[in-house]
Regions:
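RNA-binding accessory domains that recognize and position tRNA/RNA substrates
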Residues: 1-152, 164-212
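ATP/NTP-dependent adenylation/nucleotidyl-transfer catalytic domains that generate, transfer
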Residues: 2-13, 24, 260-269, 286, ...
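ATP-dependent adenylate-handling ligase core
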Residues: 180-321
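Acidic-basic catalytic patches of nuclease active cores, encompassing PD-(D/E)XK
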Residues: 492-537
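Active-site metal-binding core of divalent-cation-utilizing nuclease and nuclease-like domains
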Residues: 533-556
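Conserved catalytic cores of phosphodiester-cleaving nucleases, focusing on short active-site segments
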Residues: 552-554, 558-569
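Catalytic cores of nucleic-acid endonucleases
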Residues: 566-606, 614
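Domain-level recognition of nuclease-like catalytic cores that cleave nucleotide substrates
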Residues: 601-627
Length: 627
């Protein structure tokens, strides 16, 4: 079920929330006082006068949303769907409540954030007065510099680096680069890269703006997805642009990452990042222009390019060596001080493929990646404590498998397989039919690049592979043995669970199912809708001397799925456990995989973790509880 939170921001007593919502989960976010839990520092280069009131409100709203996003976790990745979403209700003091209470502005704000993070949002604004000497996000100063043409988001990754070079060196423009640094080493990396750019381009003197916004004394467990960081980032950039009288913000991101089609098709909601998705960019633009009565344009000039094509721009311009200082990892918090990149996340894998395709490996010295999924054992990586939950195998194999599948698709098949395209085509500023054609061409080029890179890597390392010097469960070992073309059972199981967890609780929200047959029928409908090809109660399966029918089985008859539904008065948990124990050995002794899906509508299982672990100690057995 979706968890509801009320977030009281500076000066709003949480008790006011509890008076109306006795069962509410509350969170207090404070920027001031001895118990503050959010730090907002001044921007590193002092170039701004006071922000206008509406801009200050926007930056504060974005800051509170970002802090709440970090502090309120979604739960584990086994809880995808309604349980993955959060119902976030903010009470925020603002200088200009008339602007934020405007129905259209408020609706656009909620729509923008809801699409970005796949959560529910509500905002309640209270009038506040600006206090004398109050700390501002933007510091004051009178530094003189050549007036910028645009404000560019600058994360320090390959795309934003190339965007900066594209504007400064190729187009002879003068962008102001703005960054957000939540951690000291992020600041250091960005500054190091800026220093390298200035050494190559000494005439570029426009200040680099760094905003420091982060949690103070954060809890050990934080929400890692950080979808709302993009809203904070764009809010900062828009406020800077407004102060300087600029109406253009550049967001340089290659189209493959911006669109971010799911590596596995059943990924849902907040599991797929939308931080620079065309629809999100247009939603933010519409929201901002309505609130400020402005004409801001947010542009992504790299949307129709792959990352390898972006690197070719940098290479052709003569600045390829700068990639050594760039940083692309999406798991910065868990990479070590010895390596800039984790090597496991999709961003790291895509970066490596692009660098290989552009033949720029010499600018990535040994140690750039903490884990080398290409030649290291993927199970070995997953066994390390820090990387245990990264799904290294699923991510790496899924990346290559997705390229194989997309490369074979006709335009019609591509659209059918990835209906997410419909979210992007209306927002590219060109006719939708042309937009689809260009996105299809982009994805085909990306797939062909990935496959060419792995063709080359396997050929280059064939001796090491055949002699066992490269583990068979490394990505190269798996690709060489065509393992990426076969069904990855753990990934297959998680896909099924995502589908069920996303929808079963919603189906039975008003009226619980009467029996297991009703649950099975609902599941069958979901499988058909999401194109999961399963057989329902396949005719009697013979194992040894016994025969029985599973609820569902895959076409290869290697995965058997059974639904269990404990419910009062007679279908008790003990009976469910007995039935599962009777089936487990029958499956495992015959080298089959078993997935038991327990729909616990009445929450009769008190210790879900132990319940699952008691069965999953057997090989090839998966147990998932959906509530």
């Amino acid at each position: 079920m979706t968890a509801t939170y009320w977030i009281s921001c500076d000066g709003i007593p949480p008790e006011l929330v509890l008076l109306k919502h006795e069962d509410a989960k509350t969170l207090s976010i404070k920027r001031y006082g001895p118990d503050k839990n959010l730090f907002v520092g001044s921007i590193g280069i002092q170039i701004f006068e006071n922000l206008d009131a509406i801009s200050e409100d926007l930056v504060n709203i974005a800051t509170y949303v970002y802090a709440a996003d970090r502090l309120i976790t979604r739960g584990t990745e086994k809880n995808i769907g309604p349980g993955w979403k959060r119902d976030l209700n903010f009470i925020i003091p603002v200088l200009e409540p008339r602007v934020w209470d405007n129905k259209k502005v408020n609706t656009l704000l909620k729509d923008t954030l809801s699409f970005l993070s796949d959560d529910f949002y509500n905002f309640h604004f209270i009038k506040r007065e600006r206090e004398e000497g109050e700390s501002q996000v933007f510091a004051f100063g009178e530094e003189v510099f050549k007036h910028p043409d645009s404000v560019n988001l600058f994360s320090g990754g390959i795309d934003s680096l190339t965007g900066a070079i594209n504007d400064i060196a190729i187009s002879n423009k003068n962008p102001l680069l703005i960054s957000h640094w939540p951690m000291p080493y992020t600041k250091t990396r960005q500054q190091r890269l800026i220093k390298s750019i200035r050494q190559k381009l000494p005439d570029y003197k426009t200040p680099h703006v760094q905003a420091r916004i982060h949690l103070k004394n954060p809890p050990e467990r934080q929400e890692y997805t950080q979808r709302s960081r993009s809203f904070l980032y764009l809010s900062l950039a828009s406020a800077v642009a407004r102060q300087l009288g600029i109406n253009r913000v550049h967001v340089y991101e290659n189209g493959v990452i911006a669109l971010n089609l799911p590596i596995w098709k059943q990924s849902v909601g907040g599991m797929d990042t939308r931080t620079v998705h065309p629809k999100y960019i247009k939603l933010f633009e519409s929201f901002y222009n309505e609130a400020f009565n402005a004409d801001l344009k947010i542009l992504n000039p790299f949307f129709l390019k792959t990352r390898a094509e972006v690197l070719e721009i940098l290479k052709s311009a003569g600045y390829a060596e700068l990639i050594e200082e760039s940083h692309s990892c999406s798991r910065t918090r868990v990479s070590s001080k010895f390596a800039q990149h984790c090597g496991v996340c999709s961003q790291c894998i895509d970066r490596r493929v692009a660098v290989e395709a552009a033949n720029l490996q010499r600018y990535e010295p040994k140690g750039t990646y903490e884990n080398d999924v290409f030649i290291e054992s993927l199970s070995g990586i997953e066994s390390k404590k820090t990387w245990r939950k990264t799904k290294a195998r699923a991510m790496a194999v899924g990346y290559v498998k997705s390229a194989v599948e997309i490369a074979k698709l006709s335009p019609e098949e591509f659209l059918s397989s990835y209906p997410e395209i419909y979210d992007a085509t209306p927002y590219l500023g060109i006719p939708e039919e042309e937009a689809f054609s260009r996105i299809y061409d982009l994805q085909i080029r990306q797939s062909e690049t990935v496959l060419k890179v792995f063709d080359s890597l396997v050929k280059k390392n064939v001796k090491k592979i055949t002699r066992g010097a490269i583990p068979k469960d490394s990505l190269l070992g798996i690709v060489a043995a065509q393992g990426h073309l076969t069904e990855d059972i753990p990934l297959y199981v998680e896909n099924i669970i995502r589908i069920l967890t996303n929808s079963l609780p919603t189906i039975f929200q008003k009226e619980p199912p009467k029996n297991e047959s009703v649950v099975q029928a609902a599941a069958e409908g979901l499988f058909k809708t999401t194109r999961v090809d399963l057989d329902r109660e396949f005719p009697q399966l013979a194992f040894a001397t016994r025969g029985f029918k599973a609820d569902f089985t895959n076409k290869a008859h290697t995965v058997f799925i059974e639904f269990k539904y404990p419910h009062p008065p007679n279908r008790k948990v003990a009976q469910i456990i007995k039935e599962m124990n009777e089936k487990i050995l029958l499956y495992t002794d015959n080298e089959a995989y078993a997935l038991f899906v327990v729909y616990d509508h009445y929450k009769m299982i008190s210790d879900r973790k132990t319940f699952c672990e008691d069965f999953e100690k057997y090989d090839r057995v998966f147990v998932r509880i959906i509530v």
